[in-house]
Amino acid sequence: YVVDRNVTQKDNFMEIGGERKTVQLPSCRVLKLTQPPVVWKQKKEGIVEAERMFSFGEVPLEVTAGDSLQQGSFSYAGDMEAFMSMTSVGDTLLVTFDFPEDKLEQHLQNDIWIRVRSEGMELRLPAEVQAVVVDVEDMEANFYGLRCDTLSFRTRYLARLEDCHVTALAAQAQSLHFNSGTVRNLYLNLDEIADWDVNTGSFHIDTEHLSGSRY
């Protein structure tokens, strides 16, 4: 199948502003940012088309350590709250972004590919968090200043690590960049990674545990 991502010629940006808001996060072991799955339909023979897709390529996410009390928080443009919800399921906190048609501006209601534009989000991790999942279309995740024994993360798009020091790290992203920091044991499944690089002048890895169909 060929996926048709053509956009209309008119402006298909969804601007979300408002006064910046910060909310405290409950204790959790897994923190997942997500959006409802895309519904695909047959457009014509050999081509499938999304009913509607929302790209967060212009809403970067910074993931950092919690405050001095190791409490977690989430910061974002205030108007984003109308399109997000937080729910706890077991030891997992779900932050879901959803854009129902009745909340879309008129000029966007016929668009298939809508690009969300807003100020960057900041996620400060609660002390107990062991896994971060960013299952959001095109969202860049920048991990900064983390100090922990064990962490795993999975992002749908791009991830960068700056000044992160982790004993055991399992990482997965389409594009993965280790810019500065240290990892004693790094676990990668290369079948799930399109490209990755390590700045050897400022990032040190003791042992790489590589898996995938070629290993």
Regions found by a protein language model. Give the residues of each.
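Hydrophobic membrane-insertion alpha-helices, especially the h-region
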Residues: 1-2
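Right-handed parallel beta-helix
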Residues: 58-168, 176-180, 196
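Short extracytoplasmic
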Residues: 9-56
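Generic low-polarity alpha-helical segments
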Residues: 24, 31-33, 71-73, 86, ...
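Short, surface-exposed interaction patches in beta-rich subdomains
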Residues: 164-215
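Generic marker of "main functional regions" within proteins
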Residues: 38-43, 96, 161, 171, ...
